């Protein structure tokens, strides 16, 4: 679904983003410094986050711009870079905060960062001083089997299809 917002004074959620043609999910919102613009990932199919794109949207005007094809879970780094996940790696691209535009080529920064191919989530964060923390692991398919686990640890498979389950 599209993203929604609630005033700091409370009230009902209001639509913030609307799908462009072919989009079916907006996820991983992150405010840019100043709080007047928002980064997010827009996907065309929930099962293919490698085809997602990174988008920026002005909260004042609603104007949006596509920034990166094939990226998800965007964040702004204090170094002046837009950082995002792509295929189990983090990439960084120079970003002009005033013009809300990418100003250079993307470069890989960290390989082997855990990323869900099911929902596009990339497990990383920055501190206020720019330090990066992440979970190692690369792309994870999310395919799993449901089992009963006894108190002694033995597993009994359930008659359920193997697929990406969430909890």
Task: Describe the function of each predicted region.
Residues 1-3, 20-41, 63-85, 113-133, ...:
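Conserved beta-propeller blade repeats
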């Amino acid at each position: 679904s599209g993203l929604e917002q609630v005033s700091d004074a409370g009230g009902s959620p209001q639509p913030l983003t609307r799908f462009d043609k072919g989009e079916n999910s907006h996820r991983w919102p992150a405010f840019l410094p100043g709080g007047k613009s928002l980064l997010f990932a827009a996907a065309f199919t929930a099962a293919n986050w490698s085809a997602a794109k990174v988008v920026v949207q002005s909260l004042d005007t609603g104007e949006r711009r596509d920034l990166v094809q094939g990226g998800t879970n965007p964040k702004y780094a204090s170094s002046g870079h837009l950082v995002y996940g792509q295929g189990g790696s983090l990439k960084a691209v120079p970003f002009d905060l005033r013009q809300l535009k990418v100003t250079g080529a993307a470069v890989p920064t960290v390989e082997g960062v855990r990323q869900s191919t099911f929902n596009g989530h990339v497990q990383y964060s920055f501190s206020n001083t720019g330090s990066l923390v992440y979970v190692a692991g690369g792309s994870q398919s999310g395919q799993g089997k449901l089992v009963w686990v006894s108190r002694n640890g033995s597993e009994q498979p359930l008659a359920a299809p193997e697929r990406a389950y969430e909890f």
